[in-house]
Amino acid sequence: MKKKLIIGTRSSPLALWQADFTQAELSKHFPDLEIELKLVKTTGDVLLDSPLSKIGDMGLFTKDIEKHLISGEIDLAVHSLKDVPTETPEGLMLSAFTEREDTRDVIISKNGESLKTLKQDAKIATSSLRRTSQLLSMRPDFQMGDIRGNLNTRFKKFDESDFDAMMLAYAGVHRLNFGDRISEILPHEVMLPAVGQGALGIETRVDDEATKEIVSVMNNVNTEFCTKAERALLRHLQGGCQIPIGSYASLKNGNLHLLAYVGSVDGKRTIRNEITKENCTLPEQAEQAGIELAEELLKQGANEILAEIRKTC
């Protein structure tokens, strides 16, 4: 058994919440284990002047931490799973998937308006093409804009801006105690979340058996199966830049149900589909469900939509 673990994390308030949560959970199971946090500044934390859609988001918030993991400076990295590319660097692996927070997106509006009651041509802040596409498919009158930065910064910028509303993930808003700012929680029928949204992914070195055994106490099998299905779908579709794909999997009584959305950025072309995999007892079966649904989306024309978007990446 190791006597000390070093956790690598970004320094944003939400990332620190996630690292502190991981540290506390591990300490419950291993009270004699010394745990240290190492803060790492990532490319995504530095490049705040450009929208994510312009600079891409493949590993922007993970690569720099992974370098420390590969070199042995840290023993594990704690990520928001939605930020983790579907292909991990050689020698690294996701060793635990934590119990998932509510995966839905929320609307934060200046005067408590909902999606339906926001005024004509309302100005909406989001850095996500996925949210932009789904919103415009329902409300093509919306004027979309971008706010970057950590959650605290985004709230400050929003309050000082002329935006009417802002879209965020419930998980981060709840974890940092901004829940009283929520105007509406959007159901999956309206807005599908990002792949892995609401879950933490704990990354280790493949050959570090001691650390893998320690972090295994945090693995939630339901989260593992569901997010592996979502990530397999994304891996089968994605080309290397931020694209409007939403997905959500649920596992009940051994049956995995997977929903997916692909749309053009302007929301004029959209595809939604779903699949159920019965008796899903292995993670490989969950991943196969993701691949099968991705194939169905491609047959429905998702490849044409994604090809157009990739031209601008």
UniProtKB/Swiss-Prot annotation:
PROSITE patterns: PORPHOBILINOGEN_DEAM (PS00533). Binds 1 dipyrromethane group covalently. GO terms for molecular function: hydroxymethylbilane synthase activity. Pathway: Porphyrin-containing compound metabolism; protoporphyrin-IX biosynthesis; coproporphyrinogen-III from 5-aminolevulinate: step 2/4; Porphyrin-containing compound metabolism; chlorophyll biosynthesis. The modification S-(dipyrrolylmethanemethyl)cysteine is found at C241. Its cofactor is dipyrromethane. GO terms for cellular component: cytoplasm. It holds the Pfam family Porphobil_deam. It catalyses: 4 porphobilinogen + H2O = hydroxymethylbilane + 4 NH4(+). It is an enzyme of class 2 (transferase). GO terms for biological process: chlorophyll biosynthetic process; protoporphyrinogen IX biosynthetic process. Its EC number is 2.5.1.61. PANTHER family: PORPHOBILINOGEN DEAMINASE. Tetrapolymerization of the monopyrrole PBG into the hydroxymethylbilane pre-uroporphyrinogen in several discrete steps. Monomer. Belongs to the HMBS family. The porphobilinogen subunits are added to the dipyrromethane group. NCBIfam families: hemC. This is Porphobilinogen deaminase. The lineage of its organism: Bacteria, Pseudomonadati, Chlorobiota, Chlorobiia, Chlorobiales. The gene is hemC.
